[in-house]
Amino acid sequence: MNSQIKNKAVYWGTGRRKTSVARVRLIPGNGQIKINGRSGDDYLNFNPSHLNSVKAPLQTLGLENSYDIFVNVFGGGLTGQADAIKQGAARALCDLSPDNRKPLKTEGHLSRDPRAKERRKYGLKKARKAPQFSKR
């Protein structure tokens, strides 16, 4: 069964963070990143922390120049989208080989970050901010 996985040319993974959802395709190549049809540098505004976040799963396995990353991502902001891409790439690498799961799990690339915006409650101005209290 392992040989069947190796022969497949495209590896898919889905990642989520806050309200962002990323569908990631890994294709054997030279390490280029395309996000929504634009280069990864251009889409992420040349922000090194976002770029490092996207490349982290490949760097963990030493495959940063072996696979091209093609992404469709929507929702949220750039930080949420970058972390969603990271999780999607990690899941695609698990599809590539089951042996990749353990190092990716120890680095935390497969974990869904549960933090999201807290809902606003009635009687308050924001999720936790109360109107000014006057004793008299």
Swiss-Prot record:
SUPFAM superfamilies recorded: Ribosomal protein S5 domain 2-like
Record region (Disordered): 96-136
Coiled-coil annotated spans: none
Top-level taxon: Bacteria
InterPro entries on file: Ribosomal_Su5_D2-typ_SF (IPR020568), Ribosomal_uS9 (IPR000754), Ribosomal_uS9_bac/plastid (IPR023035), Ribosomal_uS9_CS (IPR020574), Ribsml_uS5_D2-typ_fold_subgr (IPR014721)
Biological process according to GO: translation
Protein family per UniProt: Belongs to the universal ribosomal protein uS9 family.
PANTHER family in alphabetical order: RIBOSOMAL PROTEIN S9 (PTHR21569), SMALL RIBOSOMAL SUBUNIT PROTEIN US9M (PTHR21569:SF1)
Name this protein carries in UniProt: Small ribosomal subunit protein uS9
